[in-house]
Amino acid sequence: MSMGRSPSTTFRSRTGSHGARDLIAGHGRNSRRISQMHVNILHPQLQTMVEQWQMRERPSLETENGKGSLLLENEGVADIITMCPFGEVISVVFPWFLANVRTSLEIKLSDFKHQLFELIAPMKWGTYSVKPQDYVFRQLNNFGEIEVIFNDDQPLSKLELHGTFPMLFLYQPDGINRDKELMSDISHCLGYSLDKLEESLDEELRQFRASLWARTKKTCLTRGLEGTSHYAFPEEQYLCVGESCPKDLESKVKAAKLSYQMFWRKRKAEINGVCEKMMKIQIEFNPNETPKSLLHTFLYEMRKLDVYDTDDPADEGWFLQLAGRTTFVTNPDVKLTSYDGVRSELESYRCPGFVVRRQSLVLKDYCRPKPLYEPHYVRAHERKLALDVLSVSIDSTPKQSKNSDMVMTDFRPTASLKQVSLWDLDANLMIRPVNISGFDFPADVDMYVRIEFSVYVGTLTLASKSTTKVNAQFAKWNKEMYTFDLYMKDMPPSAVLSIRVLYGKVKLKSEEFEVGWVNMSLTDWRDELRQGQFLFHLWAPEPTANRSRIGENGARIGTNAAVTIEISSYGGRVRMPSQGQYTYLVKHRSTWTETLNIMGDDYESCIRDPGYKKLQMLVKKHESGIVLEEDEQRHVWMWRRYIQKQEPDLLIVLSELAFVWTDRENFSELYVMLEKWKPPSVAAALTLLGKRCTDRVIRKFAVEKLNEQLSPVTFHLFILPLIQALKYEPRAQSEVGMMLLTRALCDYRIGHRLFWLLRAEIARLRDCDLKSEEYRRISLLMEAYLRGNEEHIKIITRQVDMVDELTRISTLVKGMPKDVATMKLRDELRSISHKMENMDSPLDPVYKLGEMIIDKAIVLGSAKRPLMLHWKNKNPKSDLHLPFCAMIFKNGDDLRQDMLVLQVLEVMDNIWKAANIDCCLNPYAVLPMGEMIGIIEVVPNCKTIFEIQVGTGFMNTAVRSIDPSFMNKWIRKQCGIEDEKKKSKKDSTKNPIEKKIDNTQAMKKYFESVDRFLYSCVGYSVATYIMGIKDRHSDNLMLTEDGKYFHIDFGHILGHGKTKLGIQRDRQPFILTEHFMTVIRSGKSVDGNSHELQKFKTLCVEAYEVMWNNRDLFVSLFTLMLGMELPELSTKADLDHLKKTLFCNGESKEEARKFFAGIYEEAFNGSWSTKTNWLFHAVKHY
């Protein structure tokens, strides 16, 4: 196509040319016309647009492929583009030409636009986009105003197109380039085009997307934007405001003579990032020190030394940054020992280091973000709501201006539409099966197919029906409706229809086979009853499938089978009752027999009531899985007021009583009672967000209470289970998703972790072109987060690019020998390492990746050829904490189970620390970043037990496996304590005083290491027993040089261990060998009655008791994690193993302590078995 640049250039055909004025005035031979002589008769507004259009830059119509006649006749008048042979003619003005289009007026504007751009593809011009999503329509309305048409969902017949001059104008809205760039960046971060995602959105998901934007906009206006309250300001996590320093820690610090190390540099050095030659001041440890008081002491010492910088302004403020990390301690009400980073250093016998930073320089990195750009789909949604006459916006405020957020939450239509309430219906639920499609039944004439229907709420089945058996080759039913024993007035608003399709042989009483299953809510996203005929795509009957998932298999994953059913219609829209109707019913109902219940105001009188013991007995019976009889359910229901005020966690029990959900009066009262319900525990709230509760009212209540209880310090521990809770949501718009979005926008670190965990989720769902409902929901949540945090997009983009490059390299080196692969890795890194430097670590943004150390990059020897990479830690004084950031990149392993175990370990660590027990756990970071792709933090200065075992030869390795003191000897060596022969040679050159000082320091270091080993052994013994971690051998047990013991590689959990000849290899409850006990006893032989081992046993029992007190929380966490569909966490038996190790049937702390004391004795007496396994492992792998 040749291009014309002059404003006077006209469209040209092969036989002649006419000006733009003629083109606008003429509509072709078959079109309606206005005067071709004068355009001045048009409306003045339109005349202005015509004149502006005439002055555009435009091309000629001479096309290389000869298709120019598509738009112009030989006479120079535009041909009609035919979309529909019997439609109306509409003129569409593009930025660079005009086209006349014959189309049906019933076509949606979005479809019209997409088809039009496909037809005019030969007319594309380089300076203009030919993507339909980059344009919106404008028209001249009845008031003579130029109006933008943002709602693409309406048909052309709804537009104000004048019969004498039907014309539409296409234009690119203001800011379209920024929107395009933003969409492109977000698409890159997601790994999937937003344009394609938009095309796949149905009406519910478009509403969800607009709601997410409204929440994003509201949150961004209210979150911290300045100073230390800035949403990205990295305050170090702390345990509890006002908490005193534990006495044990205080004694440990004083014995080790620890102090605070303060580092200061001049302003110019800080600006340039120079960390060498920093001034150091040591300040004596004070258990009551706060950041404010420590700074005050430091500045006082500086004045005494007469040290200052003339470049600093007189009013300069100061921050304390933890050495080696981008985290600060600034809260004046929090003691330093309550900060996690400070306490960990003290517990490890290390002096906490602080870099004193200038506030003015630090806060430059946390400036106010630029205003949000309102995306085009929001304006489209506002217009749609206005045209649909829907009344309430997302934030329940009336529309103030055309720029406000009109996004719907109250989905009820206006009175002009025919509608009734569910409570107006006087009928039972009726459903008709229609047919089964998309499934190839076995070619056997005797095959039948049938459907099982059930209506449920949570774990309760309210009604069920099984259809007649029909011939599988036809798989069609007659027009008979099946009537369910479910009165419509009593149908709960969150009732779910479960459909299961089965087939088998007619003449044989053999096992039936499952075609598939699907669960669908009986109400739609508008909160209206589903009516009419529906086609639902079934889920394949996979063994690990999440059968609680609500929604169809829209992506056709695993099967193309579908079922068509018809739900009885009532001649109009049927809406669910509102909260006001529930309240009215409860207040004015005429039957009061069940309202005379235990009120619960006086706790003492309640527990003395004879019915209380029966209540406790029934609760235990229910929790054991036994279904309560109706009279027993009534007894529990009579105690609802007591439960509301005294035992709010029993809401779980009430929500699982069939008695509640089969009568609208009962669940209406429960809804009303929730308004004044005492907050349940975190464990109970998480349980209510799992598969046991599908009711949206109760789930909303649980989210609200969870949001109140989880502080910013602890919220990150629950991101993973809350993501799984999303999978149990019946609708796209959920309170769980909104809470995750809000928290992520208000805390950069939460947002960073949420993004990567969500990206790993959608990576597993990216295996087909038709994206699943779950994929689209999560993608929209991620998009909303990135739109609200544009600054994070730049960081995420670099990290995504890093993952892509490492994936490419790991694939490249997979088939190579280890040494050759390492050389190839380093060659590749030399050309791209600059792309992976000077950025936040994907594992934890508090660490800054500096220069990559290419010579330390290696390919590990395992089958998947993981890559081990090292960077310099760019944070100041990183030598005190973590000089290098090392990580392993894995391509081909599913890291989700490891991440689950380590997340639970982090929760345990947090709970133990809150109970003043520091078990020195090392929950290193693991981050899945895609399908079978992820990175693992490398813990520095450590070795596996096997590496410690390996000596100078085969026999030496075998002997060390048997030698109970080899671990203790290794620890002594790391502390500088040599064996007697080596020691005598070295000491011969030193005087006696030097010898004594060196020996004292080495022994002090050794005993500190033994103490670390003791507490870490306590933590991992209890944790691995509770989680049933198996396949423990000397290659996945590690020891740091300072004595910390920890586990890696969690391939087998919840009792799933390796077996040989049907016998499990790991027969001990947890690892406790003679080698460990020798270290605990500081090298002395094992004696179970010794003070050291009795102390170890006591600590183990105390640590277990703390976990037992929180048993409900762990059961809730693992129950939610069923949504991950891991092979070893997928069944009730897996959860039963956890309940067994947590001694959930125990009724008292004494019983729990006695239970674990028995477990300890079993591990102690069976230590020889583990020792033998280690010997065979060493011999096999040497």
Curated annotation (Swiss-Prot):
Changing residue 842 to S: In hx546; increases lifespan. Increases dauer formation. Fails to avoid NaCl after exposure to NaCl under starvation conditions. Defective in aversive olfactory learning. The keyword ATP-binding applies. Residues 859-865 are annotated as: G-loop. GO terms for molecular function: 1-phosphatidylinositol-3-kinase activity; 1-phosphatidylinositol-4-phosphate 3-kinase activity; ATP binding. Keywords: ATP-binding, Kinase, Nucleotide-binding, Transferase. GO terms for biological process: cell migration; cellular response to salt; chemosensory behavior; chemotaxis; dauer entry; dauer larval development; determination of adult lifespan; embryo development ending in birth or egg hatching. It catalyses: a 1,2-diacyl-sn-glycero-3-phospho-(1D-myo-inositol) + ATP = a 1,2-diacyl-sn-glycero-3-phospho-(1D-myo-inositol-3-phosphate) + ADP + H(+). CDD domains: C2_PI3K_like (cd08380), PI3Ka (cd00864). Residues 74-174 form the PI3K-ABD domain. Gene3D superfamilies: 3.10.20.770, C2 domain, Phosphatidylinositol 3-/4-kinase, catalytic domain, Phosphatidylinositol 3-kinase Catalytic Subunit, Chain A, domain 4, Phosphatidylinositol 3-kinase, accessory domain (PIK). This is Phosphatidylinositol 3-kinase age-1. The gene is age-1.
